[in-house]
Swiss-Prot record:
Pfam families according to UniProt: zf-C2H2
Species per Swiss-Prot/TrEMBL record: Mus musculus
Recorded phenotype for the gene knockout or disruption: Viable, with no gross morphological or behavioral phenotypes. Males are infertile with complete absence of mature sperm. Spermiogenesis arrests at the round spermatid stage, accompanied by extensive apoptosis within the seminiferous tubules. Expression of spermiogenesis-associated genes TNP1, TNP2, PRM1 and PRM2 in testis is significantly reduced.
Keywords attached to this entry: DNA-binding, Metal-binding, Nucleus, Phosphoprotein, Repeat, Transcription, Transcription regulation, Zinc, Zinc-finger
UniProt cross-references to InterPro entries, sorted A to Z: Znf_C2H2-type, Znf_C2H2_sf, Znf_C2H2_type
Region named Disordered: 1-31, 220-242, 254-273, 637-661, 717-763
Region (4 X 11 AA tandem repeats of VQLQP-[AL]-[QT]-[EG]-[VQ]-[ATV]-[ST]): 811-854
Ranges annotated as C2H2-type zinc finger: 34-56, 62-84, 90-112, 118-140, 146-168, 174-196, 202-224, 346-368, 376-398, 446-468, 474-496, 502-524, 530-552, 558-580, 586-608, 614-636
GO cellular component, one term: nucleus
Protein name (database record): Zinc finger protein 628
């Protein structure tokens, strides 16, 4: 900082005259008169002593009105205010640069003059600035006179202490005007602003890559490795550069080097290190200054001075040859032997371990300590030092000599070999052979002693060590979350502010973090700069590459503490731990289901929409997951079928049509039925098994099972694992009670025509439609004793108005109004229905109903015309067609007899569905979709049975459809059924003693084949199968 510079005389520890350094070293000053009582430092003037004492007291009485900064002296405040106003009154006569202080101009002039007036008496290093000279002296003495009042740390200068105090105070006075990010130093703010401006001033001389920071460029240089070609010759003494200062020079001033010449052997260690000076003719050289203590780069000396870095004086050097006429230092430095080729390193003498950087050696040697007086010995000469800092300062002379003879990409890094034994200076070493071609590998010289992880920079290792110690010094003031880096805290705070400062110029997306913004830009450009060295696969960022490398290394460093399972990424471990904790944080907004992974939620949401991205190439059916598609494709593979009478019997003569239906598609597949609360046993069989007539062969045959699973009742192939569909809403209930009494099963075929109601068997079931006409169907108690135990399929509804019954030709049904409820009541008290397993259905017949129906008040109701489709066993010879005990005249309905019943799976407008096929005598078929299977309500008791058990019950109804005709548009002709929404609640008329079913349903008749001007329905009709046997199996072959 500006207020922290104190011009000190280089020859003593007393305060200098205050004059700016001239071209030569200042002369010795008279003895000091004023001494500091805290540290013993002496000053010539009391004002200097007073200014110095504020260093110990921390007093800063001069505060800036524009920012929170305060200073110990008024002159420092004056210079600081020029930073706000932009005033720079002191301009360099050799270049266009201007400065706000005359001392800064004098310091800058040393770049052109090359003067280094301050020379260390212990190691010979020379400095341009007295503040850096004083800082360097403390490296020899180990003095750290500026302790932190909040922690045990101490620092060599006040600026380092001020920067450290920001860790405790959290002060960040410099704020970015674009994204609001704040910084402790103005130089950091300027560097950050390059993220928004896109400025990347540091270009690699070996590849087209550019960087925003010089330190990033230096790290990038390591990936190129040693440059090919012969090693350059060591520079003359006047060209020796300080290698601990990392400085880059623009490409325009990089000159080719001359062939190497063997230097003369050095007689003894050098006492003085001459410095590199730049001639005034090269005033346009753009130098980039880098702080050696914290590896931060700067574009000018002024910024570097404001930064006031940690260890290491910032000296600008060049990587190219310097003209011979440059001024030299007072004494020449004999050159050591050239460094041997190979990777340079620093060697620890006590244990022989080598390090690539001085910092690595410094950290390592702290483990040995300084037990003896001369514990730290130089590996290149016989010098020994009591402190590590003194040894490091001494080794700079060897570093400079080696750096002068290295290629430009490596010249800025202080890495040389300090051998255990001195090199014999007998004969000059021959020129080394050309080094191998550069190896592109990310060098990571900073290794963690705890886990072995390596890093490119010391800052990365420092942050990593906090993972082991648990230190998180940066805490969010909003939520209390703590972080190990201040930059991570600033990124986190955008969660509270919502600031998204990075906007894509191509698509307009905004981002909170620059890393996500850079990654997004590569989506547009297609750039994948990070390639795997094992397989060549490229990635958009380094984190993706690191995760990919686990595939080759097999590393799985993150283990579950509960079950021991290991993972390559922490995110996978967190997801796995939800298995143990039961956490399911992702909830579907349309249903109550929750999931452990967001991807599973996305897949689930497809079940609520029409999205089916995985389509079957054979039948076109879509699936929400690829796994479901693979499972479905197995159904197209030919499989062994189960032979038997079930589903295999086909009528020998083509039966008459029962009802026309839309022509089904040829594709077949499994249709999963909706949920069911009980187990079902149902076998569907045709008549007597007969040979299949010749015809086109089916594409494949498969045996299917209707089984009760944890997800509901499902119809699946016997060799395929059933999928797990989402449970649909519970279907509406329709109650159908079969007959209670039974007669012995006979073997005679059913009569083709109906008999009168009076001749029907006893114990028939009851169908009740409490609609407008109060229609009911009830078997008489004193009916004839010829067969019994019939089962009913309800096909028709009440007629409209006073219209009488109509004859049924094929199946021609009267236009329907609506049926409110369907109820079944036994002739006597029936509480339980027991069904006999596996009996064949031989005849299905459709007949009209005539006669009057009594309502609940005993009066005669309107004449209705229901059509009842009866499925009966072979033993039954009489068909029940009327609701009452009265006699009804015979009517011929032979065309309605169904000769065969079988199942198949067809493609409909609503997808693949299981279809009941009813074959008529004329060869035409009617297909009815199996929509649902239900059981009767429990709690019913069965009366004593005097005959065989009742047969299976089938209720035929249609599936929901969207394109249905209104009742007014229904014309005459063949009709099918449609189940509508429940009717409005209200009183329902019913005969005396007949219970009313709570869920009332509506039935509508629509034409199956469109007439002129009438649109045909888009869906097949459906059947509802009701069964109560507890055994579990529905097997049908098709």
């Amino acid at each position: 900082m500006a207020g922290s510079h104190v011009d000190m005389a280089p020859a003593s520890t007393t305060e200098g005259t205050g004059e700016k350094p001239g071209p030569t070293a200042p002369a010795p000053t008279p003895a000091a008169q004023y001494e500091c009582g805290e540290c013993g430092k002496s000053f010539r003037w009391s004002s200097r002593l007073l200014h110095h004492q504020r260093t110990h007291t921390g007093e800063r009485p001069y505060k800036c009105p524009d920012c929170p900064k305060a200073f110990k002296g008024s002159s420092a405040l004056l210079y600081h205010q020029r930073g706000h106003t932009g005033e720079r009154p002191y301009q360099c006569p050799d270049c266009p640069k201007a400065f706000k202080r005359s001392s800064l101009l004098q310091i800058h002039r040393s770049v052109h003059t090359g003067l280094r007036a301050f020379t260390c008496g212990q190691c010979g290093l020379a400095f341009k600035w007295s503040s850096h000279y004083q800082y360097h002296l403390r490296q020899h003495t180990g003095e750290r006179p500026y302790p932190c009042p909040d922690c045990p740390k101490a620092f060599k200068n006040s600026s380092s202490l001020r920067r450290h105090r920001h860790v405790h105070t959290g002060e960040r006075p410099y704020t970015c005007g674009i994204c609001g990010k704040s910084f402790t130093q103005s130089t950091n703010l300027r560097q950050h602003q390059r993220v928004h401006t896109g400025e990347r001033p540091f270009r690699c001389p070996l590849c087209p890559k550019t960087f925003t920071h010089s330190s990033n460029l230096l790290l990038h240089h390591r990936t190129h490795g040693p440059a090919p070609g012969p090693a350059p010759a060591p520079a003359p003494p006047g060209e020796t550069s300080r290698a601990d200062t990392k400085v880059l020079v623009s490409d325009a001033y990089l000159q080719p080097r001359s062939p190497p010449e063997p230097p003369a052997p050095p007689p003894q260690p050098p006492p003085v290190v001459p410095e590199l000076f730049l001639a005034a003719a090269e005033t346009t050289v753009e130098l980039v200054y880098r702080c050696d203590g914290c590896e931060q780069g700067f574009s000018s000396e002024e910024l570097l001075l404001e930064h006031q870095p940690c260890p290491g004086p910032p000296v600008a050097t060049q990587s190219q040859d310097v003209p011979a006429e440059l001024p030299q230092a007072d004494s020449a430095l004999p050159q050591p032997p050239p460094a041997t080729p190979g990777p340079p390193n620093f060697a620890c003498l006590p244990c022989g371990k080598s390090f690539r950087t001085v910092a690595g050696l410094s950290r390592h040697q702290h483990s040995h300590g300084a037990a003896s007086g001369q514990a730290f010995r130089c590996g290149s000469c016989d010098g020994a030092f009591p402190q590590l800092a003194s040894l490091l300062a001494h080794q700079q002379c060897h570093v400079e000599e080696a750096a002068a003879g290295r290629p430009p990409p490596q010249a800025e890094v202080a890495e040389v070999t300090c051998p255990q034994e001195p090199v014999a200076p007998a004969t000059p070493a021959p020129p080394p052979p050309p080094p191998p071609a550069p190896v592109v590998s990310a060098e990571r010289p900073y290794k963690c002693a705890e886990c072995g992880k390596a890093f490119k920079g010391s800052s990365g290792l420092r942050y990593h060590l906090r993972d082991h110690t648990g230190e998180r010094p940066y805490q969010c003031g909003e939520c209390g979350k703590a972080f190990k880096r201040s930059s991570l805290l600033a990124i986190h705070q955008r969660v509270h502010t919502g600031l998204r400062a990075f906007t894509c110029g191509q698509c307009g997306l905004t981002f909170k973090w620059s890393s996500h913004y850079q990654y997004h830009l590569r989506l547009h450009s297609g750039e994948r700069p990070y390639a795997c060295t094992e397989c060549g696969k490229a990635f958009r960022n380094t984190s993706c590459l690191r995760r990919h490398r686990h595939v080759h290394t097999g590393e799985r460093p993150h283990s579950c503490s509960v079950c021991g399972k290991s993972f390559a990424q922490t995110s996978n471990l967190r997801q796995h731990q939800r298995v143990h904790t039961g956490e399911r944080p992702f909830r579907c907004p349309l249903c109550p289901k929750t999931f452990t992974h967001s991807s599973n939620l996305l897949l689930h949401q497809r079940t609520h929409s029409a999205e089916r991205p995985f389509a079957c190439p054979i039948c076109g059916r879509g699936f929400v997951m690829a796994a479901y598609l693979q499972r479905h494709l197995r159904t197209h593979t030919p499989a062994t079928t189960t032979s038997g009478t079930t589903g295999s019997a086909v009528a020998s003569q083509p039966p008459a049509p029962l009802a026309a239906a839309p022509t089904p598609l040829a594709a077949q597949d499994v249709h999963v039925l909706p949920n069911l609360q009980a187990t079902l046993s149902l076998e569907v069989a045709g008549g007597t098994a007969q040979p299949t007539p010749p015809g086109p062969a089916a594409p494949s045959s498969q045996t299917f099972l209707l089984v009760q699973t944890a997800q509901g009742l499902q119809l699946i192939p016997s060799s395929v694992q059933s999928p797990t569909p989402p449970p649909p809403p519970p279907p509406p209930k329709v109650i159908l009670l079969p007959p209670a009494s039974a007669g012995g099963p006979g073997s005679g075929a059913a009569r083709p025509g109906p008999r009168s109601v009076g001749k029907a068997g006893q114990g028939t079931g009851v169908v009740w439609f409490p609609g407008p006409g109060g229609l009911g169907l009830q078997g008489g108690a004193n009916a004839g004793a010829s067969g019994g135990g019939q089962s009913l399929i309800v096909l028709q509804n009440v007629g409209s108005g006073e219209t009488g019954p109509q004859e049924v030709s094929g199946v021609q049904l009267q236009p329907a109004q609506e049926v409110a409820t369907v109820q079944l009541q036994p002739a006597q008290e029936v509480t339980t229905v027991q069904l006999q397993p596996a009996q064949e259905v031989t005849t299905v017949q459709l007949q009209p109903l005539t006669g009057q129906v009594s309502n609940s008040n005993g009066g005669a109701g309107t004449t209705e015309a229901p059509n009842l489709l009866l499925v009966q066993s072979g033993a039954t010879e009489e068909l029940l067609t009327g609701p009452g005990p009265g006699e009804v005249g015979d009517s011929e309905a032979g065309a309605g007899v169904v000769q065969d019943v079988l199942f198949e799976t067809l493609q409909t407008d609503e997808g693949l569905q299981s279809v009941l096929v009813l074959s008529g005598a004329d060869g035409e078929q009617t297909r009815l979709c199996v929509q649902e299977v239900e059981t009767l309500s429990p709690g019913l008791a069965e009366p004593a049975a005097t005959g065989p058990s009742g047969q299976k019950l089938l209720i035929i109804r249609s599936a929901p459809a969207t394109d249905l005709l209104e009742n007014s548009s229904v014309a005459g002709g063949t009709t099918t059924l449609q189940l509508l929404a429940p009717s409005a609640p209200g009183p329902v008329s019913a005969p005396v003693g007949v219970p009313v079913a709570p869920p009332s349903q509506m039935v509508q008749v629509v034409p199956a084949v469109a007439g002129p001007g009438v649109m045909a329905p888009q869906n097949l009709p459906s059947i509802q199968i009701v069964q109560t046997l507890p055994a579990v199996q529905l097997v049908h072959t098709f």
